[in-house]
Amino acid sequence: TFKPLLYTLAVTDAGYTPETNIPGGPLTLGGKTISTEGGTMAYCLAKSLNGAAWHLMGTIGVHRTIEFARQCGIAAKLPPYPSIALGAAEIPMLQMLQSYTMFPNKGFNTPPVYFTRIEDKDGNLLYEFPISQSKEVIGEADAYTMVKLMQGVVQFGTARRVNSYNIPAEKAGKTGTTNGNTDGWFIGYTPELLAGTWVGCEDPFIPIYSSNSGGAEMSAPKWGLFMSNVYADKRLPYGKVTSFEQPAELKNNPIFAEQNFANIATSGDSLDAEENTDHRDDLMGNEEGDVTDDKLLKDSAAKKIKPAPKKKESDY
């Protein structure tokens, strides 16, 4: 689930768009060579391709990525290594949720408020807590670009299963499986509500032995069930806004037309999901010969790719 932060920096700092191509090809990590898929940025995020995240980390840089994560509300320890792009850091769910608030909130990050008010048994207000102060961390157009990219995850990628639930609103999000396959995540949102689900063991040393039990297969359906129940409950104030609002500056951009975006989000190398490919969500693996941080740093320096051309007004 950390990958969207890296992709955000590709948009804001390097000028990437959903149709920017990220190359695939052989990638050697920890003495093991895998065949990585390439494709458009929309395709790579939808499929959660590790090789693409690796290339983006080489472009953006580790320290800039950590700096941005801090701006988004992530206070957890982030090791200064490229492996954070592949799920190597332990980040609490609430911190990840706060970092995602900028996407549906048009670029504004909002700290969580755990209690909004206290009432007595008769419903009399005893105390009302102040509303969190939001701060802008990215522009509205960049936030909407990321919303579209993360809608691709739900429409064409690893979180397609949430579409089987009756949620009468547009959906976007990201699956995740942490390093060592100990946690399965899904963080998703509609225009009105952001929520996250986690599957794992209290003891982080106990892995989920099947990669089919990670974010895509276990966490995403739980999110879908929760959200469908929320929207079905007429006592709750959700369902008034069902579509993400497109900024005026992007309305004439052909990239965001539905059919065009569908074509962009499904444009990849289409490798078979074999053991030597990177169809493993955020998972780095836990086999003998895994990647070390020193090796990651060395490979990162060798695998840098050129930033995309800076965005011009005509791009938006």
Enumerate the language-model features and the residues they cover.
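Gly/Ser-rich catalytic serine loop of serine hydrolases
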Residues: T1-F2, A88-I91, G215
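Active-site SXXK
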Residues: T1-I22, C44, S99-F103, M146, ...
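Active-site catalytic microenvironments for nucleophilic, acid-base chemistry
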Residues: L9-A14, T59, R64, M102, ...
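Conserved catalytic neighborhood of penicillin-recognizing serine enzymes
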Residues: Y16-T65, Y81, N109, K121-G152
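Mid-domain, small-residue-enriched loop/turn segments at the edges of structured enzyme/sensor domains
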Residues: T33-S35, G61-Y100, G107, P111-Y114
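A penicillin-recognizing enzyme superfamily signal
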Residues: A46, P92-M93, L97-Q98, M102-F256, ...
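Long, low-complexity, intrinsically disordered segments
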Residues: E288-Y316
